[in-house]
Swiss-Prot record:
Keywords: Magnesium, Metal-binding. One of its GO terms (molecular function) is mannonate dehydratase activity. It holds the Pfam family MR_MLE_N. Gene3D superfamilies: Enolase-like C-terminal domain, Enolase-like, N-terminal domain. The keyword Membrane does not apply. Has no detectable activity with D-mannonate and with a panel of 70 other acid sugars (in vitro), in spite of the conservation of the residues that are expected to be important for catalytic activity and cofactor binding. May have evolved a divergent function. This is D-galactonate dehydratase family member Achl_0790. D-arabinonate binds at residues 219, 269, 290, 319, 346. The keyword Magnesium applies. InterPro entries: D-mannonate_dehydratase-like, D-mannonate_dehydratase_GalD, DgoD-like, Enolase-like_C_sf, Enolase-like_N, Enolase_C-like, Mandel_Rmase/mucon_lact_enz_CS, Mandelate_racemase_C. One of its GO terms (biological process) is amino acid catabolic process. It comes from the Bacteria.
Amino acid sequence: MKIIAADVFVTSPSRNFVTLRITTEDGVTGIGDATLNGRELAVAAYLKEHVAQLLIGKDPHRIEDTWQFLYRSSYWRRGPVTMAAIAAVDMALWDIKGKVAGMPVYQLLGGASRNGLRAYGHASGADIPSLFDSVREHLELGYKSIRIQTAVPGIKAVYGVAAQAQASGERYDYEPAGRGAFPVEEDWDTRAYLRHLPSVFEAVRNEFGPEIPLLHDGHHRMTPIQAAKLGKALEPYDLFWLEDCTPAENQEALRLVRQHTTTPLAIGEIFNTVYDYQTIIKEQLIDYVRAASTHFGGISPLKKVMDFAAQYQIKSGFHGPTDISPVGFAAQLHVGLAIHNYGIQEYMQHSDKTNEVFHQSMTFKDGYLHPGDEPGIGVEFNEEAAAAFPYQQAYLPYNRLVDGTVHDW
């Protein structure tokens, strides 16, 4: 069996997605996700101009060899554009292998290690009453674990707090990327955030009790001392994790944070390779791996990093907002179902328009996800539907402090 075509599609059903479709001489197709929020066309061009032609004539079953070829042969390694492109190829090849075998991908990874995958949802609010309403809504939807993000007095817009209204009767989760030719500027005040956040978790615990696992995302905005202070202040509220508390580039910061708090730590949604995790896993500076299949090179390296993490009792907490397409999301569900050290899966529901383009076998019931038992990844791409939603330029926002200094968003 040989590959005869590799086609790239950019579509925007509610948001932009980059999809790779690989076709074999036997007519078997596989799809992969190469979406990089705010930089979609960069990955699409990389795939079209530098990768697609290299796949023609290759054996689709040689997944590891193809992965290593794409990673090493260009000499220029790592980085979000390169790794998203490689991820799409890797997913598509696993999809083909599963279809040829007549099995879902998780069976090829060793079979299921559990019956379902615990998921968490995103609750947010401009104030405490609206936050409570959002928590209740997510509990009614079946979520058993909730991420808590809230507005901060004195700050106009805060990451993780939905600003847009619902439209056409459709429920939307938080979408930070703004359509347009330039990113939106937001303001930030870390001291105000640190003063306010513990009282939010106190209020949520008083309202909903001690049993619900609660999570929070710091989004890389704190110094090590600030993160340590926050982790300590949140200890009475028994968080499931504090995510991305310090900038991802400064991994040594986690040593200081770890020394000062027992609040569990998660990081890695902007990591691209297992090498980014080497030190923090070996030194047990984190509790959860936040990598995403789409930005990490695909299914193959995601499974590898989790096998490495298992030696240190570190679990998965894969990145899963709606800027991961249904293809990329399903890919990491297969990994999560197969590995022993699964922790939790972030899950934001895609829009109805997105579901017109990507037909999924995935299910969500009573707080648990399952990738389904269709052969391959379990997602089919509707090219005709995708054509009805052309690309729209979009950017993630950026932060400035009160004095005008650019700050981590």
